UniProtKB/Swiss-Prot annotation:
Residues 1-23 form the signal peptide. One of its GO terms (biological process) is killing of cells of another organism. Keywords: Antibiotic, Antimicrobial, Cleavage on pair of basic residues, Cytolysis, Hemolysis, Immunity, Innate immunity, Secreted, Signal. Thermostable. Still active at 100 degrees Celsius. Residues 24-35 form a propeptide. The keyword Secreted applies. It is found in: Secreted. This is Ceratotoxin-D. One of its GO terms (cellular component) is extracellular region.
């Protein structure tokens, strides 16, 4: 279950970081772009942790219900 939690948090982190980078102004200078990505990831980590704490119990409940329906 720890691997599932890690994958889930990575997906949330990537989604939030992507939206932060897309929403941020772009620049042709690669250093500025790297800093923007770094800042987006730093901002996304705490948000991903909060979302993960709420979403993982919901996902577990849904998986158990689906497992009962299928099995």
């Amino acid at each position: 279950m720890a691997n599932l939690k890690a994958v889930f948090l990575i997906c949330i982190l990537a989604f939030i970081a992507f939206h932060c980078v897309v929403g941020a102004p772009t620049a042709e200078d690669s250093i500025v772009v790297k800093r923007s990505i770094g800042t987006a990831v730093k901002k996304a980590v705490p948000i991903a942790k909060k979302v993960g704490k709420v979403a993982i119990p919901i996902a577990k409940a849904v998986l158990s219900v689906v497992g009962q329906l299928v099995g």
